[in-house]
From Swiss-Prot:
One of its GO terms (biological process) is response to oxidative stress. The record marks R70 as: Transition state stabilizer. It catalyses: 2 a phenolic donor + H2O2 = 2 a phenolic radical donor + 2 H2O. Ca(2+) 1 binds at D75, V78, G80, D82, S84. The gene is PER70. One of its GO terms (molecular function) is lactoperoxidase activity. Ca(2+) 2 binds at T196, D247, S250, D255. This is Peroxidase 70. Substrate binds at P165. Heme b binds at H195. Its cofactor is heme b; Ca(2+). Belongs to the peroxidase family. Classical plant (class III) peroxidase subfamily. It comes from the Eukaryota. Transmembrane segments: none annotated.
Length: 330
């Protein structure tokens, strides 16, 4: 069993620039939202309740860490961070092809159930998802950061609205998708490096290792030694749903290993490998790896970018609600 008391203290971050406000209760409508300390005495133990649920589920299945991180990303990039991805039903976001492999819905519902007992009708599912993503990243060895709270849950969830960055996207397309959400190129590289944990299905990348762009050969940017390794795990006639670790050699640890793999031509996804071959994004990767000055500290930059992402198009006022259960509107 993994101990949570031995996490790298350098990754426990308390940057003042992430703290929007403190000691504010959710009854004061004159203060901005989201903000840290939003719930105040109305639900003073919200973070400890979520953390407890996250810890038990991480111990039960560490794969919940990349699962919830990916879910948070998919939620925020479609109509903002409003937990619309959690809504179940015909033609909801959950039914869109990119979301069919999402996992961890039960974790968020478990936290919601406990919070409804402790603080009825107070904490939004969107806030729970943001907190859970932070806590799972931290348990996997990544940074901790203050999460501004006060999001409301959305009432609309449509599969037709799901437009997400794809695994074969060029840097230009990825930049466009991120810019639409007011995220810059550095945010793009840093958040893509979240692939340091998790897996991908063979169907997403197999052609790249066998028949790239219908050439009958692998993508020439892939390291020759990496090709047979992936081909063995994802044979042409194999199950397309087979999962392969994104970060070869360090798939369950949040670190810079995946970025180093990109440098060595061992990126599993084309959309990630192009971050090294592109002249604009490569210097950012180098700075995160400590190969180019001024250096960037991955944990610190990931916390910054996650904080920005978690505030995309949030719902406030009459635009949202506090759901009683996360899978259905009130």
């Amino acid at each position: 069993m993994r101990s949570f008391t031995n996490l790298n203290p350098c990754y426990v971050l308390l940057p003042f620039f992430l703290v929007l406000a403190t000691n504010a209760t959710h009854t004061n409508n004159f203060l901005p939202r989201p903000r840290t300390g939003y719930y105040g005495s109305a639900c003073w133990n919200v973070e400890s309740i979520v953390r407890s649920v996250v810890e038990s589920n991480y111990l039960a299945n560490p794969a919940n860490a990349p699962g919830i991180l990916r879910m948070h990303f998919h939620d925020c990039f479609v109509q903002g961070c409003d937990a619309s991805v959690l809504l179940a039903g015909p033609n909801s976001e959950r039914t869109a092809i990119p979301n069919l492999s999402l996992r961890g819905f039960n974790v968020i519902e478990e936290a919601k159930t406990q919070l409804e007992i402790a603080c009825p009708r107070t904490v939004s599912c969107a806030d729970i998802l943001a907190l859970a993503a932070r806590d799972f990243v931290h348990l996997a060895g990544g940074p901790w950061w203050p999460v501004p709270l006060g999001r409301l849950d959305g009432r609309i969830s449509l599969a037709s609205n799901v437009i997400l960055p794809g695994p074969t996207d060029s840097v230009a397309v990825q930049k466009l998708r991120f810019a639409e959400k007011n995220l810059n190129t550095q945010d793009l590289v840093v958040l893509a490096a979240g692939h340091t944990i998790g897996t991908a299905g063979c169907i997403v990348f197999r052609d790249r290792f066998f028949n790239y762009d219908n050439t009958g050969s692998p993508d020439p940017t892939i390291a020759p030694s990496f090709v047979p390794l992936i081909q063995a795990q994802c044979p042409l006639n194999g199950d397309p749903a087979t999962r392969v670790v994104l970060d070869t050699g360090s798939g369950d640890q949040f670190d810079t290993s995946y970025l180093n793999n990109l440098k060595n031509g061992r990126g599993l996804l084309e959309s990630d490998q192009v971050l090294w071959t592109n002249l604009e994004t490569r210097p950012i990767v180098e700075r995160l790896l400590g190969l180019r000055f001024p250096f960037l500290i991955f944990g610190l930059e990931f916390a910054r970018s996650m904080t920005k992402m978690s505030q995309i198009e949030i719902k406030t006022g009459l635009d949202g609600e506090i759901r009683r259960v996360c899978s259905a509107v009130n």
